[in-house]
Amino acid sequence: MEHNPDLFLALKGGNNNFGIVTKFEMKTFSQNNMWGGGVFTDTSPWVSLVDDFQKFATNPDPFGTLILARVYSPQLTGAVVNAYSSDASNVSPVLKNMTTVQPQFLNTIREDTLSGFAKEQADFNPGGARHLFFTTSFHLSRDVMLKAAEIFDEALVDLKTIPNYVLSMVFLPITKRTIEASNKIGTNALNLSPGDGPFVIVLFSSVHENASDDAKVISRVQGLRAKFEKLAAEEGSASKFRYLNYAFKDTPVFQGYGTDSIAKLKAASKKYDPQGFFQRVVPGGFKISSV
């Protein structure tokens, strides 16, 4: 950070374009038991859940976080709320309200350690399946979230014919407070400012069993993502940001960083990897040379 600030910035969001990190130095903090967990419900309270999501995203709890998902599996069609607070004694009323929604098929809300919550999430995602991620984002909009449920349900008409298929449309709010806190501890390549918030990262998480279904699944979920982006544009809520860790290989991740950030990434690549080793030889990832 002190000796090569341009490389430090590039590594924070630049994917595998610049080198191999062999050492991390991280600030740590103590953490007592947290409050949180998940609640599984049906689709009937979707409107009220979206309304509470809007409240949280515009007036966030500094100690809380929230994920709201529309889900389909052979066992359940409905919604999932994952809510957490690092201050178990002072949980946001909005989070409490969302986790008392009815009906409930499963409720894991409790006080637990961070590792306990991490294990719970891992247990919900067992290995051995063909798990694909697709992503987009939009500026916070109640109408987008309500209408998105309709296009999600339309996509399922064809997709649910696939044996044991599971699809989730997951909404993760990125608040102004989150962006401000991130910028205070150092710049990165994402090029986000508080004025970009609140916006919402969308993850389409798709799980199927057989390779013979790959082409159908990819095509249909890409179509769902395209319809979602068209909806967001029509509602005046489109966002160019694409979260790299959720991005399918066709996603224009770096384009969402903006021209200034792209120029800095390309300059760092030319300076620290003049032969283009990480562009030509290292497989996978998103290559800055392709932008």
Kindly give the residue locations of the regions a language model identified.
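Soluble FAD-dependent oxygen oxidases
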Residues: 1-291
